[in-house]
Amino acid sequence: MAICRILGIDPGSRITGYGIIDVRGTAIDYVDSGCIRLATQLMPQRLMTIHQGIFELVQQYHPQQFAIEAIFVHKNPNSALKLGQARGVAICAAVLSGLSINEYAAKSIKQAVVGKGGADKIQVQHMVKILLNRQGAIQSDAADALAVAITHAHHLQTLACQRPRQTDYWVNGNAS
């Protein structure tokens, strides 16, 4: 059975989390996770750091799929603009690497991982550890990125279940 490697991204203007998983059928295996920390650089340098970080992850791990948290309405317009810029350069790095973009709303991610769209960060972190059989602590932003990747894995598994099997064609009397 083929392995599909997914790179999940939790974008941020100060910290961008990443999570990499392998999917084989219904099995999901942890590969790596972490954070691209952006310190106190000016915004253009932060954006360049995000772009380079994502590009390097793609070069090192060779994912076949890319998933990112979709934009949400933020109370602070300035923060929303910065988050949009961070997402934009992450998406740009993925597209330039030949990956298609898969976006998931925060509520959908929480629903897929925890079972309820209103889950908090601690619940998401806990379920990510359980689903990926991890013992040690996972950084919050990295756990969120792994949750994005897990959500995409569930989406791919659902699509695979909906495809008609080749044998269905023959069983249903379609052979001539």
From Swiss-Prot:
The gene is ruvC. Its main location: cytoplasm. It is found in: Cytoplasm. Pfam families: RuvC. Binds 2 Mg(2+) ion per subunit. One of its GO terms (biological process) is DNA repair. GO terms for molecular function: crossover junction DNA endonuclease activity; DNA binding; magnesium ion binding. This is Crossover junction endodeoxyribonuclease RuvC. Mg(2+) 1 binds at residues 10, 141. Belongs to the RuvC family. Gene3D superfamilies: Ribonuclease H-like superfamily/Ribonuclease H (3.30.420.10). Keywords: Cytoplasm, DNA damage, DNA recombination, DNA repair, DNA-binding, Endonuclease, Hydrolase, Magnesium, Metal-binding, Nuclease. It is an enzyme of class 3 (hydrolase). Its cofactor is Mg(2+). The RuvA-RuvB-RuvC complex processes Holliday junction (HJ) DNA during genetic recombination and DNA repair. Endonuclease that resolves HJ intermediates. Cleaves cruciform DNA by making single-stranded nicks across the HJ at symmetrical positions within the homologous arms, yielding a 5'-phosphate and a 3'-hydroxyl group; requires a central core of homology in the junction. The consensus cleavage sequence is 5'-(A/T)TT(C/G)-3'. Cleavage occurs on the 3'-side of the TT dinucleotide at the point of strand exchange. It comes from the Bacteria. PANTHER family: CROSSOVER JUNCTION ENDODEOXYRIBONUCLEASE RUVC (PTHR30194:SF3). It catalyses: Endonucleolytic cleavage at a junction such as a reciprocal single-stranded crossover between two homologous DNA duplexes (Holliday junction). Its EC number is 3.1.21.10. Mg(2+) 2 binds at residue 69. The active site is at residues 10, 69, 141. Homodimer which binds Holliday junction (HJ) DNA. The HJ becomes 2-fold symmetrical on binding to RuvC with unstacked arms; it has a different conformation from HJ DNA in complex with RuvA. In the full resolvosome a probable DNA-RuvA(4)-RuvB(12)-RuvC(2) complex forms which resolves the HJ.
